[in-house]
Each structure stands twice: as structure tokens, then as C-alpha cells.
Amino acid sequence: MIKKILIVDDSPVSIKIMKSCIPKDKGYELFDAADGRIGVDLFKQIRPELTFMDLTMPVMNGFEALEEIIKLDASAMVVIATADIQVRAIARAHDLGAFSVIKKPPTKENVAAAIAEVENELAGRG
């Protein structure tokens, strides 16, 4: 069951949009980080069940942050949220351990679908 969701994105506008797409009635605790380094540090502290990660960020990009998070927790559920939907970028994200990829800007529908997929995966793990 998802309780905590971490959003890692260098754009305050993108974070605001993502937060607006996450259902309010589920009681999720939302956290955000402005770059990959802060995101990894926050992940260590709060251990969210779901992380939405941008790819293009300063300090530490999303690929590097994803790699660090998967080293910390191989079963971490990281959904990449990016405008870069090139096949190569998506393949690299999956190779590094991303659970799935959604296109930015996010919509309530694709965020809800991503959350449902993660919930199903977590339920299947028991």
C-alpha cells in the first residue's frame, strides 16, 4: 500500500502539476526534492513506496538518482516522469530499474494509472 510519494523534479511548476494530479482522497503523504541528490537523500530518510522522477535536473540527473535509489533498495518503485520520451532514454531508465515511464506534462489519468500499477505490484509482492 502506498503511503508516501516522493516527487523529484527541478521545476517547481512541474512539482505543483504532479501534486495536482495525485488523488487527494487517498491520504498520501507527498514529499518533493529539487534535484537528484536531494531526492536520493530524502529517499533514504522517508523510504517512500513510490517516487516520481524527472530525468533532466542539475546536480544529479534522474538516471544517476535512479541508479543510487535502486542500489539502496532494489525493489524501489520509481516512475520516470519526463518530456524526453526517446526510445533510448526510456530503455536506459528501464535498464537502471525504473518501474515505468510517464510523459510530461502528467495528467490525472496517467498519474492515477501509474499509482494503480505500483499498488498492484506491491500487493503482488505480499
Give names to the regions the model predicted:
Residues 64, 85-100:
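Alpha4 helix (beta4-alpha4-beta5 surface) of REC/receiver domains from two-component response regulators
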Residues 35-38, 61-64:
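Acidic catalytic/metal-coordinating carboxylates
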